[in-house]
Amino acid sequence: MVAKILDGKQIAKDYRQGLQNQVEALKEKGFTPKLSVILVGNDGASQSYVRSKKKAAEKIGMISEIVHLEETATEEEVLNELNRLNNDDSVSGILVQVPLPKQVSEQKILEAINPDKDVDGFHPINIGKLYIDEQTFVPCTPLGIMEILKHADIDLEGKNAVVIGRSHIVGQPVSKLLLQKNASVTILHSRSKDMASYLKDADVIVSAVGKPGLVTKDVVKEGAVIIDVGNTPDENGKLKGDVDYDAVKEIAGAITPVPGGVGPLTITMVLNNTLLAEKMRRGIDS
């Protein structure tokens, strides 16, 4: 069998059209969602990613701004800027682009974001709400993964789902979202023994560790659904996923490519959460 290719670009395009329609409806009520992104320093990849978010937000009718601070900015300066945005009533959602320079504590900054404007979903309050099944803002990559599975009409109930990676950004939250859909979830990580035995029994594999070629054809069950979150640049700058794509697609039931799989949905869910933040503060039901 040859796998169904889960085209993240097309799924994102369709989803963003729905978001654009909702933004237009909000504007008719006199409200325009605004996304503010804090960028500290001049890291090329971060600058590119921030520009992509701004462009995507504006394309669906939102307002977006980049607050660019110098690489030498102190933690206090970043916190002051963040506090200004927290108190700015025109701002619906805030995100802080990571990584941050070494003099700035990432955790301290993330905890200083107003939880009601935390469109990345990384504030401890929002993480906690996810774990008691009362989530509002969910981290964007896990949310995007669930949209891909939903779009592909993958029934997760009772399925064996294996998540490789235990980060707070992807691995742990996506495991919780899969549990909410009644999947039986196993989390594997760098200390796990005999990973192959778990993978061979998996109906769904989500790999998010950044190790190209980690998931090979011999450990994938025929018909399994493969979600590849890896995006490691090779020596030529070409992005590689965690999955041996060309081989695994010959046996899998469905698979995401890299690039063009999960990535487009991550930015889309930033927009989704920004819209949600605006609706919540205006008392408008989603």
Curated annotation (Swiss-Prot):
Keywords: Amino-acid biosynthesis, Histidine biosynthesis, Hydrolase, Methionine biosynthesis, Multifunctional enzyme, NADP, One-carbon metabolism, Oxidoreductase, Purine biosynthesis. GO terms for biological process: L-histidine biosynthetic process; methionine biosynthetic process; purine nucleotide biosynthetic process; tetrahydrofolate interconversion. GO terms for cellular component: cytosol. NADP(+) binds at residues 165-167, 190. GO terms for molecular function: methenyltetrahydrofolate cyclohydrolase activity; methylenetetrahydrofolate dehydrogenase (NADP+) activity. Pathway: One-carbon metabolism; tetrahydrofolate interconversion. Pfam families: THF_DHG_CYH, THF_DHG_CYH_C. It catalyses: (6R)-5,10-methylene-5,6,7,8-tetrahydrofolate + NADP(+) = (6R)-5,10-methenyltetrahydrofolate + NADPH; (6R)-5,10-methenyltetrahydrofolate + H2O = (6R)-10-formyltetrahydrofolate + H(+). InterPro entries: Aminoacid_DH-like_N_sf, NAD(P)-bd_dom_sf, THF_DH/CycHdrlase, THF_DH/CycHdrlase_cat_dom, THF_DH/CycHdrlase_NAD-bd_dom. Its EC number is 1.5.1.5, 3.5.4.9. Transmembrane segments: none annotated. The keyword Oxidoreductase applies. Catalyzes the oxidation of 5,10-methylenetetrahydrofolate to 5,10-methenyltetrahydrofolate and then the hydrolysis of 5,10-methenyltetrahydrofolate to 10-formyltetrahydrofolate. Homodimer. PANTHER family: C-1-TETRAHYDROFOLATE SYNTHASE, CYTOPLASMIC, C-1-TETRAHYDROFOLATE SYNTHASE, CYTOPLASMIC-RELATED. Belongs to the tetrahydrofolate dehydrogenase/cyclohydrolase family. This is Bifunctional protein FolD. The gene is folD.
